[in-house]
Amino acid sequence: MAEYPFVGTGFHTGDGYVLTNRHVVQPWLADERAQSLTSTVNGKPRLKKLMAFFPDSSQSITLKYKQAASGEDVAVCTIDPKDLPAKLPVLPLEKESESVAIGRIVVTMGYPSGPERLLAMLPEDEARGIQSRYGSYDSLLTYLAQTKHVHPLMTQGNITDLDARRIVYDARTGEGGSGGPLFGPSGRVIGITFAIFTENTASNFAVPIHYAITLLEKAGWTSPATPEADATNTVQAAAK
Protein backbone atom coordinates (compact mmCIF):
# COMPACT_ATOMS: atom_id res chain seq x y z
CA MET A 1 0.00 0.00 0.00
CA ALA A 2 1.40 3.40 -1.01
CA GLU A 3 0.72 6.51 1.06
CA TYR A 4 1.29 10.12 0.05
CA PRO A 5 0.91 13.25 2.19
CA PHE A 6 -0.82 16.26 0.66
CA VAL A 7 -1.07 19.82 1.94
CA GLY A 8 -3.68 22.45 1.15
CA THR A 9 -5.53 25.35 2.73
CA GLY A 10 -9.02 25.67 4.19
CA PHE A 11 -10.92 28.16 6.33
CA HIS A 12 -13.60 28.16 9.03
CA THR A 13 -17.03 29.61 8.18
CA GLY A 14 -18.73 29.06 11.55
CA ASP A 15 -20.14 26.19 13.65
CA GLY A 16 -17.26 23.91 12.69
CA TYR A 17 -17.81 24.11 8.92
CA VAL A 18 -14.60 24.36 6.89
CA LEU A 19 -14.34 25.22 3.19
CA THR A 20 -11.58 23.98 0.90
CA ASN A 21 -11.15 22.48 -2.58
CA ARG A 22 -12.45 19.12 -3.72
CA HIS A 23 -8.95 18.26 -4.95
CA VAL A 24 -7.54 18.95 -1.47
CA VAL A 25 -9.76 16.33 0.21
CA GLN A 26 -9.67 14.00 -2.83
CA PRO A 27 -6.10 14.67 -4.02
CA TRP A 28 -5.97 11.64 -6.30
CA LEU A 29 -8.26 13.53 -8.70
CA ALA A 30 -5.43 15.92 -9.56
CA ASP A 31 -2.25 14.08 -8.56
CA GLU A 32 -0.29 12.30 -11.30
CA ARG A 33 1.31 9.82 -8.87
CA ALA A 34 -2.05 8.59 -7.60
CA GLN A 35 -3.54 8.43 -11.07
CA SER A 36 -0.59 6.44 -12.37
CA LEU A 37 -0.77 4.02 -9.44
CA THR A 38 -4.50 3.36 -9.75
CA SER A 39 -4.19 2.79 -13.50
CA THR A 40 -1.53 0.09 -13.06
CA VAL A 41 -2.66 -1.52 -9.80
CA ASN A 42 -6.05 -2.98 -9.01
CA GLY A 43 -6.78 -0.57 -6.20
CA LYS A 44 -8.91 2.38 -5.22
CA PRO A 45 -7.53 5.54 -3.59
CA ARG A 46 -8.95 6.66 -0.27
CA LEU A 47 -8.34 9.36 2.28
CA LYS A 48 -6.63 7.87 5.32
CA LYS A 49 -7.02 10.92 7.54
CA LEU A 50 -7.63 14.64 7.25
CA MET A 51 -5.98 16.90 9.79
CA ALA A 52 -6.18 20.67 10.22
CA PHE A 53 -3.69 23.01 11.89
CA PHE A 54 -4.99 26.49 12.73
CA PRO A 55 -2.89 29.52 13.77
CA ASP A 56 -2.72 29.96 17.56
CA SER A 57 -3.92 26.38 18.09
CA SER A 58 -1.27 24.02 19.45
CA GLN A 59 -3.13 20.82 18.58
CA SER A 60 -4.13 19.27 15.28
CA ILE A 61 -7.85 18.92 14.63
CA THR A 62 -9.49 16.03 12.80
CA LEU A 63 -11.68 17.10 9.89
CA LYS A 64 -14.56 15.05 8.57
CA TYR A 65 -15.22 15.23 4.85
CA LYS A 66 -18.87 16.22 4.38
CA GLN A 67 -19.52 16.74 0.67
CA ALA A 68 -18.18 18.28 -2.52
CA ALA A 69 -19.70 20.13 -5.44
CA SER A 70 -20.13 18.09 -8.60
CA GLY A 71 -18.99 20.84 -10.95
CA GLU A 72 -16.91 23.36 -9.00
CA ASP A 73 -13.71 22.59 -7.11
CA VAL A 74 -15.26 23.15 -3.68
CA ALA A 75 -15.67 20.86 -0.67
CA VAL A 76 -17.13 21.14 2.81
CA CYS A 77 -15.59 19.53 5.89
CA THR A 78 -16.71 19.65 9.50
CA ILE A 79 -15.09 19.71 12.92
CA ASP A 80 -16.64 17.67 15.72
CA PRO A 81 -18.17 20.14 18.24
CA LYS A 82 -16.09 18.66 21.07
CA ASP A 83 -12.89 19.42 19.12
CA LEU A 84 -13.86 22.94 18.03
CA PRO A 85 -11.53 25.57 19.58
CA ALA A 86 -13.46 28.14 21.61
CA LYS A 87 -12.11 31.19 19.78
CA LEU A 88 -11.58 29.84 16.27
CA PRO A 89 -12.12 32.87 13.96
CA VAL A 90 -15.04 32.81 11.53
CA LEU A 91 -14.31 34.29 8.11
CA PRO A 92 -17.26 36.32 6.77
CA LEU A 93 -18.53 35.42 3.29
CA GLU A 94 -19.49 38.03 0.68
CA LYS A 95 -23.06 37.63 -0.58
CA GLU A 96 -23.17 40.73 -2.79
CA SER A 97 -21.87 39.92 -6.29
CA GLU A 98 -21.61 43.64 -7.11
CA SER A 99 -18.49 43.85 -4.94
CA VAL A 100 -16.57 41.60 -7.37
CA ALA A 101 -15.23 43.45 -10.41
CA ILE A 102 -12.11 43.62 -12.58
CA GLY A 103 -9.50 45.92 -11.05
CA ARG A 104 -10.70 45.53 -7.45
CA ILE A 105 -8.08 44.94 -4.78
CA VAL A 106 -7.98 41.41 -3.35
CA VAL A 107 -5.99 39.64 -0.65
CA THR A 108 -5.30 35.93 -0.65
CA MET A 109 -4.43 33.87 2.41
CA GLY A 110 -2.99 30.36 2.51
CA TYR A 111 -0.10 27.99 3.01
CA PRO A 112 1.84 27.79 -0.27
CA SER A 113 4.63 25.19 -0.08
CA GLY A 114 3.13 23.83 3.16
CA PRO A 115 5.58 23.25 6.05
CA GLU A 116 8.57 24.07 3.81
CA ARG A 117 7.57 27.76 3.78
CA LEU A 118 6.97 27.75 7.54
CA LEU A 119 10.47 26.35 8.07
CA ALA A 120 11.93 28.91 5.68
CA MET A 121 10.72 31.67 8.02
CA LEU A 122 13.00 30.34 10.78
CA PRO A 123 16.78 30.74 11.13
CA GLU A 124 18.51 28.25 8.81
CA ASP A 125 20.22 26.23 11.56
CA GLU A 126 17.01 25.97 13.58
CA ALA A 127 15.00 24.90 10.53
CA ARG A 128 17.56 22.26 9.58
CA GLY A 129 17.52 20.84 13.11
CA ILE A 130 13.73 20.70 13.23
CA GLN A 131 13.54 18.96 9.86
CA SER A 132 16.08 16.33 10.90
CA ARG A 133 14.17 15.55 14.11
CA TYR A 134 10.68 15.51 12.66
CA GLY A 135 10.67 13.63 9.39
CA SER A 136 7.00 13.01 8.65
CA TYR A 137 4.50 15.73 7.77
CA ASP A 138 2.38 14.79 10.80
CA SER A 139 5.14 15.16 13.37
CA LEU A 140 6.64 18.23 11.67
CA LEU A 141 3.35 20.13 11.50
CA THR A 142 2.46 19.10 15.05
CA TYR A 143 5.76 20.54 16.30
CA LEU A 144 5.29 23.75 14.31
CA ALA A 145 1.78 24.13 15.75
CA GLN A 146 2.95 23.53 19.31
CA THR A 147 5.68 26.15 18.90
CA LYS A 148 3.25 28.70 17.34
CA HIS A 149 4.88 28.71 13.92
CA VAL A 150 1.76 28.01 11.85
CA HIS A 151 0.95 31.31 10.13
CA PRO A 152 -0.64 31.81 6.70
CA LEU A 153 0.91 33.89 3.96
CA MET A 154 -1.13 36.94 2.94
CA THR A 155 -0.54 38.69 -0.39
CA GLN A 156 -2.31 41.53 -2.15
CA GLY A 157 -3.21 41.92 -5.82
CA ASN A 158 -6.07 42.75 -8.16
CA ILE A 159 -8.80 40.96 -10.06
CA THR A 160 -7.54 40.74 -13.64
CA ASP A 161 -10.39 38.81 -15.29
CA LEU A 162 -13.80 37.51 -14.37
CA ASP A 163 -16.58 35.26 -15.59
CA ALA A 164 -19.51 33.37 -14.07
CA ARG A 165 -17.40 30.44 -12.86
CA ARG A 166 -14.05 31.92 -11.91
CA ILE A 167 -12.23 34.96 -10.56
CA VAL A 168 -8.77 35.53 -12.03
CA TYR A 169 -6.36 37.47 -9.81
CA ASP A 170 -2.65 38.28 -9.60
CA ALA A 171 -1.92 38.11 -5.85
CA ARG A 172 1.03 35.77 -5.45
CA THR A 173 0.47 32.28 -4.04
CA GLY A 174 1.69 28.75 -4.80
CA GLU A 175 1.05 25.02 -4.51
CA GLY A 176 -0.43 24.41 -1.06
CA GLY A 177 -2.45 27.62 -1.30
CA SER A 178 -5.32 25.77 -2.97
CA GLY A 179 -8.49 26.01 -0.89
CA GLY A 180 -7.50 29.35 0.59
CA PRO A 181 -9.85 32.34 0.90
CA LEU A 182 -9.73 35.27 -1.50
CA PHE A 183 -10.86 38.48 0.21
CA GLY A 184 -12.44 41.49 -1.47
CA PRO A 185 -12.03 45.15 -0.40
CA SER A 186 -14.68 44.74 2.32
CA GLY A 187 -12.65 42.04 4.06
CA ARG A 188 -15.22 39.37 3.19
CA VAL A 189 -14.37 36.20 1.29
CA ILE A 190 -15.30 36.49 -2.39
CA GLY A 191 -13.74 33.27 -3.66
CA ILE A 192 -11.74 30.09 -3.00
CA THR A 193 -8.42 29.61 -4.78
CA PHE A 194 -8.46 26.44 -6.88
CA ALA A 195 -5.80 26.78 -9.61
CA ILE A 196 -2.34 28.27 -9.37
CA PHE A 197 -0.03 29.02 -12.26
CA THR A 198 3.54 29.46 -11.07
CA GLU A 199 4.75 30.64 -14.49
CA ASN A 200 2.18 33.44 -14.70
CA THR A 201 1.47 35.32 -11.49
CA ALA A 202 -1.43 37.15 -13.15
CA SER A 203 -3.44 33.97 -13.63
CA ASN A 204 -4.47 32.42 -10.34
CA PHE A 205 -8.09 31.22 -10.30
CA ALA A 206 -10.73 31.27 -7.57
CA VAL A 207 -14.24 29.80 -7.45
CA PRO A 208 -16.80 32.56 -6.72
CA ILE A 209 -17.97 32.20 -3.13
CA HIS A 210 -21.68 31.86 -3.96
CA TYR A 211 -20.99 28.30 -5.19
CA ALA A 212 -19.51 27.49 -1.78
CA ILE A 213 -22.40 29.13 0.09
CA THR A 214 -24.87 26.92 -1.79
CA LEU A 215 -22.84 23.82 -0.88
CA LEU A 216 -22.53 24.91 2.76
CA GLU A 217 -26.28 25.40 3.07
CA LYS A 218 -26.91 21.94 1.60
CA ALA A 219 -24.58 20.55 4.25
CA GLY A 220 -26.59 22.20 7.05
CA TRP A 221 -24.61 25.40 7.61
CA THR A 222 -26.37 28.63 8.53
CA SER A 223 -24.76 32.04 8.13
CA PRO A 224 -23.52 33.52 11.44
CA ALA A 225 -25.53 36.55 12.57
CA THR A 226 -22.40 38.61 13.31
CA PRO A 227 -19.10 37.62 11.63
CA GLU A 228 -15.87 37.73 13.57
CA ALA A 229 -14.64 41.33 13.43
CA ASP A 230 -10.96 40.52 13.89
CA ALA A 231 -10.78 38.40 10.74
CA THR A 232 -12.23 41.25 8.67
CA ASN A 233 -10.00 43.89 10.23
CA THR A 234 -6.87 41.82 9.62
CA VAL A 235 -7.56 41.62 5.91
CA GLN A 236 -8.63 45.24 5.60
CA ALA A 237 -5.39 46.36 7.22
CA ALA A 238 -3.36 44.27 4.78
CA ALA A 239 -5.23 45.73 1.81
CA LYS A 240 -4.39 49.35 2.57
Enumerate the language-model features and the residues they cover:
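N-terminal activation segment of mature serine protease catalytic domains
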Residues: 1-24, 65, 71-75, 87-89, ...
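Catalytic-histidine neighborhood of serine endopeptidases
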Residues: 7, 13-15, 19-69, 81, ...
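Catalytic nucleophile loop of clan PA
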Residues: 11-12, 154, 159, 172-193
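Conserved hydrophobic/aromatic beta-strand scaffold that supports enzyme active sites
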Residues: 19, 74-78, 154-158
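A structural micro-motif recognizing beta-strand termini
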Residues: 55-56, 77-85, 92-97, 170-173
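Flexible, gly/ser-rich surface segments that form the specificity/activation loops bordering the active-site cleft
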Residues: 67, 89-165, 173-174, 195-204
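Short, solvent-exposed secondary-structure boundary/capping segments
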Residues: 72-79, 165-172, 203
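C-terminal subregion of chymotrypsin/trypsin-like serine protease catalytic domains
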Residues: 149, 161, 183-240
